[in-house]
Amino acid sequence: MIIYLHGFDSNSPGNHEKVLQLQFIDPDVRLVSYSTRHPKHDMQHLLKEVDKMLQLNVDERPLICGVGLGGYWAERIGFLCDIRQVVFNPNLFPYENMEGKIDRPEEYADIDTKCVTNFREKNRDRCLVILSRHDEALDSQRSAQALHPYYEIVWDEEQTHKFKNISPHLQRIKAFKTLG
């Protein structure tokens, strides 16, 4: 089972395309939708939904995957639910760059302070990070600096922020999922 979390643009047709691409790894891909506008509510909702899926799950090696803001959530929810994560161009600093787009961007900073101390250290090697060198929305070098001490970084030379085509990375993701 692969759980897919969309980014800020929840209505993008690219979400469906990514789900179809992920089905080459596992036919059981589940899209979990969330508001993107209310961080504390989103965290509660995502934890509840992912936990429910895991309770009914028969896959011994489930995976959670997210793009952009979905990557922010996939890393945290995956850690809290003890499943491996794959994140594409994760938005690591939404409290800085979501101003004017959501109601309370400061809630992300609050979530960061309330999350498990040094959670990335405790999550070491359980998240695969795929970053685009051509991310027009986020500073991928800053993301790499924050995540490299804990996770493997894979660089993509073609894609932009929304990562329309993940197929060149499917074999790597499949191998990572198999490690479970």
Curated annotation (Swiss-Prot):
InterPro entries: AB_hydrolase_fold, UPF0227, UPF0227/Esterase_YqiA. Pfam families: UPF0227 (PF05728). Gene3D superfamilies: alpha/beta hydrolase. HAMAP family: UPF0227. Belongs to the UPF0227 family. NCBIfam families: PRK04940.1. This is UPF0227 protein YcfP.
